[in-house]
Amino acid sequence: MNIDLNADLGEGCASDSELLTLVSSANIASGFHAGDAQTMLTCVREALKNGVAIGAHPSFPDRDNFGRTAMVLPPETVYAQTLYQIGALGAIVQAQGGVMRHVKPHGMLYNQAAKDPRLAQAIAKAVHDYDPSLILVGLAGSELIRAGERCRLVTRQEVFADRGYQADGSLVPRMQPGALIHDEEQALAQTLDMVQAGRVKSVTGVWTTVTAQTVCIHGDGEYALAFARRLRAAFNARNIHVIA
């Protein structure tokens, strides 16, 4: 059994270089919520050195609140902003002799696109128009995945090791109780349930089905590095291969 393990990087965390030895895919902040030209270049070089698949991590323009502010923008604006960020990282990747492999929206852009078909379509179209061979990463079972499929993109359905789920398969909003899982044992058990059994237990106790093609470890999490090591060990013990 194979699984992709991804992390959001280039967001100012000291553990980036170590995480790049443990994950198979890196979502690199592309300037709108965190990161700049230099951090993108540094992350790209480190990812290439470790053989890690590189992806753009576009966001709403919200550096003050780390891309976590809800915004209502015209789809054409979201299309342009997404295309701009993909292109910025893509230029750096190309200049370093690499190939960009995927795009995963960040924060509130990701969450809103999971439920808003018009927003999801704008993102998927930007990805397709930049490079139709790119993989679009989105919340499992979400509108973003459906938009990617409509645009004939390869999609990858994502699950989260350290986030609480609602009964409909969506993430618990960050400001609500149960949004974040701080207990490593709970996060590990949830991840293995999603990967091996295709199910997740919601904060209300209801089990729901989920398709896990890639698992996210938040690079800005306090225990991200230690948890990544534990998760890799758990995968190895169960003959689950981490591969992009």
Swiss-Prot record:
Gene Ontology biological-process entries: carbohydrate metabolic process
GO molecular function annotation: 5-oxoprolinase (ATP-hydrolyzing) activity; ATP binding
Catalytic function, reaction form: 5-oxo-L-proline + ATP + 2 H2O = L-glutamate + ADP + phosphate + H(+)
Alphabetical UniProt keywords: ATP-binding, Hydrolase, Nucleotide-binding
InterPro entries: Glyco_hydro/deAcase_b/a-brl, LamB/YcsF/PxpA-like
Pfam families: LamB_YcsF (PF03746)
Entry's EC annotation: 3.5.2.9
Principal EC category: hydrolase
Subunit structure: Forms a complex composed of PxpA, PxpB and PxpC.
Function: Catalyzes the cleavage of 5-oxoproline to form L-glutamate coupled to the hydrolysis of ATP to ADP and inorganic phosphate.
NCBIfam families: PRK05406.1-1, PRK05406.1-3, PRK05406.1-4, PRK05406.1-5
Family as reported in the entry's similarity comment: Belongs to the LamB/PxpA family.
PANTHER family, per database record: 5-OXOPROLINASE SUBUNIT A (PTHR30292:SF0), UNCHARACTERIZED PROTEIN YBGL-RELATED (PTHR30292)
Protein name: 5-oxoprolinase subunit A
Organism: Salmonella paratyphi A (strain AKU_12601)
